[in-house]
Design a protein with these regions (language model features):
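A structural signal for long alpha-helical coiled-coils and helix-turn connectors
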Residues: 50-53, 84, 90, 128, ...
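N-terminal helix-turn-helix DNA-binding core of bacterial DNA-binding proteins
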Residues: 23-75, 80, 155-161
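Charged, amphipathic alpha-helical coiled-coil/dimerization segments
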Residues: 81-141
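C-terminal regulatory/oligomerization modules of transcriptional regulators
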Residues: 1-6, 56-57, 133-161
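Alpha-helical linker/hinge and terminal dimerization helices associated
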Residues: 21, 25, 32, 69, ...
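N-terminal leader segment of winged-helix/HTH proteins
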Residues: 1-36, 86
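Short aromatic/hydrophobic contact patches that present stacked aromatics
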Residues: 15, 68, 102
Length: 161
């Protein structure tokens, strides 16, 4: 007779819980940002590129961008396809190494990001209203702490994108 599986341990799985809330959050933010033709992942890519170029960088190497976003490069490339097709990002030459593929945000991408920010803010406010501001703040702190610990402290705790 086969030994039964104790599912009580599975119900406490941190990964499954995180994936469940991630799906719910993604649906909420995608619903808001979809009104301007973006997903939350695409919004994050545009925001990170915008931040880098405001900081003086003309472009960001794709590998570095994937690291900053906590994404695998193949996942990032999948998210980049529609952004490229819409002319929101463009391929660039890395100034320090011409062999490195890099990206820049276009003027059209900056305009779309500006248009998207109020929709993102609305989704953020709905989340804070549903959870309560204190719980939302504690959740963000816990998530920042988990990212830092799991990456060995490599990522800044205040770098949400």
């Amino acid at each position: 007779m086969a030994k039964s599986i104790d599912l009580r341990a599975v119900s406490g799985c941190t990964c499954l819980r995180a994936r469940r809330i991630a799906r719910q959050l993604t649906q909420a933010y995608d619903g808001a940002l979809g009104l301007v033709g973006l997903t939350v992942n695409q919004f994050g890519v545009l925001a990170k590129l915008y931040g880098a170029t405001r900081g003086g960088q003309a472009s960001v190497p794709i590998g570095a961008l994937a690291d900053r976003l906590g994404m695998h490069p193949t996942t990032l490339n999948r998210d980049l396809k529609p952004l490229r097709a819409q002319g929101l990002v463009a391929d660039a030459i890395d100034a320090s190494d011409r062999r490195v593929r890099a990206l820049t945000i276009t003027d059209k991408g900056r305009a779309r990001l500006r248009k998207a920010v109020p929709f993102w803010r609305a989704a953020q406010k709905r989340l804070e209203a549903a959870l309560g501001a204190h719980v939302a703040r504690r959740l963000n702190e816990a998530l920042d702490h988990a990212v830092a610990r799991l990456q060995g402290g490599a990522q800044s705790r205040r770098d949400p994108l």
